[in-house]
Amino acid sequence: MNDVSQTAAEVLVAQPLTSVAFAPYGTVIAAPAGEGRPINGGNAQRFDLLDDLQLDAEGGRPMLALFRAQARRFPHEVSEMERHALGSQTFVPLGDRRFVIVVARAGEAPTSARQLAAFVTDGRQGVVLAPGTWHHALLAVDAGDFAVIERAGSGGVDCDVCLLREPGSVRL
């Protein structure tokens, strides 16, 4: 679904993604200011960003995937959310690719768009969604490839889906 239906009432305006605003939902991935640790004979700078992706619950292991996303049209209807209760999920654009992330706090499934928050990246930022954080599927502003790290393991797919009783839309 790309277009907003006549039933979408609540309009979320995607706010610029910041670490502070996104903290209840996970972690923002961005190149820090300043210099990292020199590696490769001084030809590269290394920045260690996050060392606990929380992917090992119930025997899980990291899975690196590539999502090739089409650009979405905005405003975009938000009527369905999903979560991964057993592990985090990471989205990193490969290149300068903006995307919108619509989220709700972990816990009970959201029932209304009023319970959601929306953020737009600057094209160079990624996010790590904390385990159990409700989120909309990837909403690429700019078409392109995204590296996705998520939990793989026994027990089937770690994905719960809910439909909002009161859907809404997100706009840039």
Predicted regions and their residues:
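Ligand-binding loop in jelly-roll beta-barrel domains
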Residues: G132-V148
